[in-house]
Amino acid sequence: MDLAMPGTPRAKELPNATNPEQLFAAGYSACFDGALQHIARQEHVKFESQVTASVSFLKDEVDQGFKIAVTLQVKGQGVEKEKLEVLVHKAHDFCPYSKATRGNIEVTLEVVE
Protein backbone atom coordinates (compact mmCIF):
# COMPACT_ATOMS: atom_id res chain seq x y z
CA MET A 1 0.00 0.00 0.00
CA ASP A 2 1.36 3.38 -0.99
CA LEU A 3 0.89 6.17 1.53
CA ALA A 4 1.34 9.86 0.77
CA MET A 5 0.25 13.14 2.30
CA PRO A 6 -1.83 15.32 -0.06
CA GLY A 7 0.09 18.18 -1.65
CA THR A 8 3.51 16.60 -1.18
CA PRO A 9 6.05 15.57 -3.83
CA ARG A 10 5.42 11.94 -2.90
CA ALA A 11 1.70 12.38 -3.62
CA LYS A 12 2.57 13.70 -7.07
CA GLU A 13 4.79 10.66 -7.68
CA LEU A 14 2.09 8.29 -6.41
CA PRO A 15 -1.24 9.76 -7.54
CA ASN A 16 -3.17 6.67 -6.43
CA ALA A 17 -1.64 6.61 -2.96
CA THR A 18 -3.88 6.75 0.08
CA ASN A 19 -3.49 9.19 2.95
CA PRO A 20 -3.93 8.88 6.73
CA GLU A 21 -7.39 10.44 6.66
CA GLN A 22 -8.62 7.89 4.12
CA LEU A 23 -7.26 5.05 6.22
CA PHE A 24 -8.94 6.46 9.33
CA ALA A 25 -12.24 6.77 7.46
CA ALA A 26 -12.01 3.19 6.20
CA GLY A 27 -11.20 1.82 9.64
CA TYR A 28 -13.86 3.84 11.44
CA SER A 29 -16.64 3.01 8.97
CA ALA A 30 -15.85 -0.72 9.06
CA CYS A 31 -15.63 -0.76 12.86
CA PHE A 32 -18.85 1.23 13.25
CA ASP A 33 -20.71 -1.07 10.84
CA GLY A 34 -19.55 -4.06 12.87
CA ALA A 35 -20.72 -2.40 16.09
CA LEU A 36 -24.06 -1.53 14.49
CA GLN A 37 -24.64 -5.12 13.38
CA HIS A 38 -23.62 -6.39 16.83
CA ILE A 39 -26.18 -4.14 18.52
CA ALA A 40 -28.81 -5.13 15.94
CA ARG A 41 -28.21 -8.84 16.63
CA GLN A 42 -28.59 -8.22 20.37
CA GLU A 43 -31.96 -6.62 19.66
CA HIS A 44 -32.97 -9.34 17.16
CA VAL A 45 -33.12 -6.89 14.27
CA LYS A 46 -31.91 -8.00 10.84
CA PHE A 47 -31.13 -5.52 8.08
CA GLU A 48 -28.49 -4.57 5.53
CA SER A 49 -26.31 -1.64 6.56
CA GLN A 50 -23.80 0.61 4.89
CA VAL A 51 -21.61 3.06 6.79
CA THR A 52 -19.60 5.79 5.10
CA ALA A 53 -17.14 7.94 7.04
CA SER A 54 -16.20 11.36 5.71
CA VAL A 55 -13.17 12.91 7.37
CA SER A 56 -12.70 16.68 7.39
CA PHE A 57 -9.40 18.41 8.04
CA LEU A 58 -10.00 21.54 10.16
CA LYS A 59 -7.98 24.37 11.66
CA ASP A 60 -7.48 23.93 15.41
CA GLU A 61 -7.97 27.33 17.04
CA VAL A 62 -6.41 26.10 20.30
CA ASP A 63 -2.88 25.59 18.97
CA GLN A 64 -3.20 26.92 15.40
CA GLY A 65 -2.54 23.41 14.13
CA PHE A 66 -5.03 21.03 12.58
CA LYS A 67 -7.67 18.59 13.75
CA ILE A 68 -10.10 16.19 12.13
CA ALA A 69 -13.84 15.76 12.30
CA VAL A 70 -15.84 12.78 11.10
CA THR A 71 -19.33 12.39 9.71
CA LEU A 72 -20.68 8.85 9.76
CA GLN A 73 -23.49 8.36 7.26
CA VAL A 74 -25.51 5.23 7.93
CA LYS A 75 -27.94 3.61 5.51
CA GLY A 76 -30.15 0.73 6.51
CA GLN A 77 -32.25 -1.43 4.24
CA GLY A 78 -35.00 -3.46 5.86
CA VAL A 79 -35.33 -1.37 9.03
CA GLU A 80 -37.46 1.65 9.91
CA LYS A 81 -35.58 4.95 10.11
CA GLU A 82 -36.60 5.58 13.74
CA LYS A 83 -35.32 2.16 14.81
CA LEU A 84 -32.11 2.65 12.83
CA GLU A 85 -31.49 5.97 14.59
CA VAL A 86 -31.76 4.24 17.97
CA LEU A 87 -29.41 1.46 16.85
CA VAL A 88 -26.90 3.99 15.46
CA HIS A 89 -26.70 5.84 18.78
CA LYS A 90 -26.25 2.57 20.68
CA ALA A 91 -23.56 1.52 18.20
CA HIS A 92 -21.81 4.85 18.76
CA ASP A 93 -21.65 4.07 22.49
CA PHE A 94 -20.30 0.57 21.75
CA CYS A 95 -17.89 1.10 18.82
CA PRO A 96 -14.17 1.01 19.79
CA TYR A 97 -13.34 3.84 17.35
CA SER A 98 -16.13 5.97 18.83
CA LYS A 99 -14.83 5.26 22.32
CA ALA A 100 -11.28 6.17 21.30
CA THR A 101 -12.30 9.44 19.68
CA ARG A 102 -14.96 10.55 22.20
CA GLY A 103 -14.08 13.98 23.53
CA ASN A 104 -11.17 14.30 21.10
CA ILE A 105 -12.80 14.89 17.73
CA GLU A 106 -16.22 15.99 16.54
CA VAL A 107 -18.26 13.04 15.28
CA THR A 108 -21.56 13.62 13.52
CA LEU A 109 -24.01 10.75 13.04
CA GLU A 110 -26.38 10.88 10.06
CA VAL A 111 -29.02 8.32 9.21
CA VAL A 112 -29.70 8.64 5.49
CA GLU A 113 -32.19 6.97 3.20
Which residue ranges define each predicted feature?
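Extended beta-strand/beta-hairpin segments
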Residues: M1-A26, D33-E113
